Swiss-Prot record:
D-ribose 5-phosphate binds at D37, G166, G227, G248, S249. The keyword Oxidoreductase does not apply. The keyword Lyase applies. The active site is at K94 (schiff-base intermediate with d-ribose 5-phosphate). It comes from Deinococcus radiodurans (strain ATCC 13939 / DSM 20539 / JCM 16871 / CCUG 27074 / LMG 4051 / NBRC 15346 / NCIMB 9279 / VKM B-1422 / R1). Pathway: Cofactor biosynthesis; pyridoxal 5'-phosphate biosynthesis. D-glyceraldehyde 3-phosphate binds at R178. Catalyzes the formation of pyridoxal 5'-phosphate from ribose 5-phosphate (RBP), glyceraldehyde 3-phosphate (G3P) and ammonia. The ammonia is provided by the PdxT subunit. Can also use ribulose 5-phosphate and dihydroxyacetone phosphate as substrates, resulting from enzyme-catalyzed isomerization of RBP and G3P, respectively. This is Pyridoxal 5'-phosphate synthase subunit PdxS. GO terms for biological process: amino acid metabolic process; pyridoxal phosphate biosynthetic process; pyridoxine biosynthetic process. Transmembrane segments: none annotated. The lineage of its organism: Bacteria, Thermotogati, Deinococcota, Deinococci, Deinococcales. NCBIfam families: PRK04180.1, pyridoxal 5'-phosphate synthase lyase subunit PdxS.
């Protein structure tokens, strides 16, 4: 329940993977939690001790990917295995958009979730991975409802806002969350006979548009990501109506990662309690410096990757 400490989520077994129902059910277990980017086993242990629901194993956090430039690819499987061995909570890892072989490799080494991520350099500018062909569940980013439903149609078990990863600036995550939730309200307001036209305009599967019309939500879990850097940022995304939060560079690029990780977990749990939010926001040390979105040239905007 929201406002209550959540039970610790464990790694999946082989028997728990495979069908869309099992994959989406596993994703539901992350609701109300925080998923943290980590680049070492020690960071993964810090995240687990802080109460993270899962960790995202990668060689460079998004802020470093931005700074270093070049082609960003799937992380070394050896590094991912080391992180998997260090913690008992689920471990996620990223693949490039459209790179089916990277996804096959991650499934083979036993990761619990794959992020088909715009943070990495896209491998295919026309097609995303057909995620339903995999036993392991996928999470994908989206800027609007049409994009979210296309990813679900391909088999994604979780959606997240794209935001602008590595900036420490939550404004784009807020924009994308409001866009998706606003589009959902707009679909709900349309009469049933107009839904085929809505599906055409959204470029989304008709049956998924029908689901949104009937239920007023996405068919899968909807998380915030991209620029979350403070407990207040995390609570803001929860108050907007999202199901949980990914935090990338915001923790381990800050002055006190342990305290900030704990504070963000508490903020997500108690996102409607200003007294607790004030308490957990105190004395955290300096956050990551951050980047103003207006300073990014179009080519540096990661959210524009994918379609």
């Amino acid at each position: 329940m929201r406002g209550q400490p959540r039970p610790k989520l464990r790694r999946m077994t082989e028997q728990q993977t495979g069908t869309p129902q099992l994959k989406q059910g596993f994703a539901e277990m992350f609701k109300g939690g925080v998923i943290m980017d980590v680049v070492t086993a020690d960071q993964a242990r810090i995240a687990e001790a802080a109460g993270a629901t899962a960790v995202m194993a990668l060689e460079r956090v998004p802020a470093d990917i931005r700074k270093d430039g070049g082609v960003a690819r799937m992380s070394d499987p050896k590094m991912i295995r080391e992180i998997m061995a260090a913690v008992s909570i689920p471990v996620m890892a990223k693949v490039r958009i459209g790179h089916v072989v990277e996804a096959q490799i991650l499934q083979a080494i036993g990761v619990d979730f794959i992020d088909e991520s715009e943070v990495l350099t896209p491998a295919d500018e026309q097609f995303h991975i057909l995620k339903r062909d995999f036993k392991v569940p996928f999470v994908c980013g989206a800027k609007n409802l049409g994009e979210a439903l296309r990813r679900v149609g391909e088999g994604a078990s979780m959606i997240r806002t794209k935001g602008e990863a590595g900036t420490g600036n939550v404004v784009e995550a807020v924009r994308h969350a409001r866009a998706v939730l606003g589009d959902i309200r707009a679909v709900q307001s349309r009469p049933a006979e107009e839904l085929m036209t809505v599906a055409r305009d959204l470029q989304a599967p008709y049956d998924l548009v029908q689901y949104v019309h009937a239920h007023g939500q996405l068919p899968v879990v909807n998380f915030a990501a991209g620029g979350v850097a403070t407990p207040a940022d995390a609570a803001l995304m929860m108050q907007l109506g999202l199901d949980g939060v990914f935090v990338g560079s915001g923790i381990f690029k800050s002055a006190n990662p342990e305290r900030r990780a704990q504070a963000i977990v508490r903020a997500v749990t108690h996102f409607q309690n200003p007294d607790i939010l004030a308490e957990v926001s105190e004395d955290l040390g300096a956050p990551m410096t951050g980047i103003n979105i207006d300073e990014l040239i179009p080519e540096a905007r990661l959210a524009s990757r994918g379609w």
